């Protein structure tokens, strides 16, 4: 049976911008693989037991921004201080949404988009 989440796969077009974004969230590159036969690169990043598998590939269609399609909607990362993470992102040049309280838990949270428009939720 399922023991936990193994990794999150992200398809990205902007290598430097994508790495900088996830590094601002504390992720570090742990592996890098170039696949000439597929004309892409896979970069593994880790932070707090969470692994991102970032596929850098040009030529894919851009993410549909709305209306939301069925399937995976967003990725949510748990943090101890959402306001502090939001400030780090702002200082790093990103534009997170306003800090708000989760409707059900009352905990602080916000959304920000990665360089390819993937919604990322930061949640206490």
Set out the residue ranges of the language-model regions.
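Vicinal oxygen chelate
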Residues: 4-14, 33, 42-44, 63-124
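A short, acidic/glycine-rich surface segment
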Residues: 30-32, 38-41, 59-65, 98
């Amino acid at each position: 049976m399922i023991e936990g989440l193994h990794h999150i796969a992200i398809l990205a077009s902007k290598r430097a911008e994508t790495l900088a974004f996830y590094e601002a969230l504390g992720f570090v590159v742990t592996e890098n693989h170039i696949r000439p036969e597929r004309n892409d690169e896979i970069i593994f990043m880790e932070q707090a037991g969470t692994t991102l598998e970032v596929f850098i590939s040009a030529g894919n269609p851009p993410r549909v921004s709305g209306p939301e399609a069925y399937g995976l909607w967003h990725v949510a990362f748990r943090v101890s201080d959402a306001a502090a993470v939001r400030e780090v992102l702002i200082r790093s040049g990103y534009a997170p949404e306003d800090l708000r309280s989760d409707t059900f838990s009352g905990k602080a949270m916000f959304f920000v988009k990665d360089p390819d428009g993937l919604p990322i939720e930061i949640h206490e």
